[in-house]
From Swiss-Prot:
The organism of origin for this protein: Arabidopsis thaliana
Domain bHLH: 152-201
Region span, Disordered: 124-156, 229-253
Gene3D superfamilies: Helix-loop-helix DNA-binding domain (4.10.280.10)
Domain of life where this protein originates: Eukaryota
Keyword terms of this UniProt record: Developmental protein, DNA-binding, Nucleus, Transcription, Transcription regulation
Name this protein carries in UniProt: Transcription factor UNE12
Subunit description: Homodimer.
Major localisation: nucleus
GO biological process, one term: regulation of salicylic acid mediated signaling pathway
Function: Required for ovule fertilization.
Xref: InterPro entries: bHLH_dom, HLH_DNA-bd_sf, IND-like
Amino acid sequence: MASNNPHDNLSDQTPSDDFFEQILGLPNFSASSAAGLSGVDGGLGGGAPPMMLQLGSGEEGSHMGGLGGSGPTGFHNQMFPLGLSLDQGKGPGFLRPEGGHGSGKRFSDDVVDNRCSSMKPVFHGQPMQQPPPSAPHQPTSIRPRVRARRGQATDPHSIAERLRRERIAERIRALQELVPTVNKTDRAAMIDEIVDYVKFLRLQVKVLSMSRLGGAGAVAPLVTDMPLSSSVEDETGEGGRTPQPAWEKWSNDGTERQVAKLMEENVGAAMQLLQSKALCMMPISLAMAIYHSQPPDTSSVVKPENNPPQ
């Protein structure tokens, strides 16, 4: 509780503490309180003089004086009567004296009211902070993430490369179906075999085409890849055997029967066998024409076979 000595230095106190110090320091406050408590009607004494309130900040060194005392003039050191009597029946609050000094009293009452209102914490003056209205939830269009399977990429270049490899694999499988007995383990060897097979087919087509046109003599080097005279054995061997044509030798070693058997079972295998021996299939009439078109060798006479291969 603050001290009742009016001459204490109250410069470090707030205006609200200064106000209470002035009210509690008045000598008439205790007398009017005692008279009010002893009254029958429970009010304050009717003859009690009004309290005097000094409005000042407490910074100039003089706070309390007599009711009619003289002090420094000015707003901060003026004494104003403060009516606290409740016998008027006009409700609670400070009572304004009826006699007045004009605008000076009204100004002092306004100052008192303002200082009293500053003592009370104002809660109703602060507006309630409303939470900002939440924006309506709008579903964002999120691009679905494409999850790649194991061993596959989602990059466009990688996808294009994978599609290219798949097309190459499909073409190679198609070639494997066209060329039988091809090596399927080594891709490089398989491609070499396919190239040789295509060359062999082209040779057969050329031979058949020239036989149709009557160029049987020009077909013989293409069929055997060597002159027909070179395919004949030496005139005399160690056993003194007579030479025989090459086609007779091929017929005697079972090549003809093997090719005929493969033609019934697998045409591709028969073609492969002929290709391995540098042979090709042609009509018998074309073979006979090629054979008879070759001039006889002066060193040896080639005896034609009576029963040519069928």
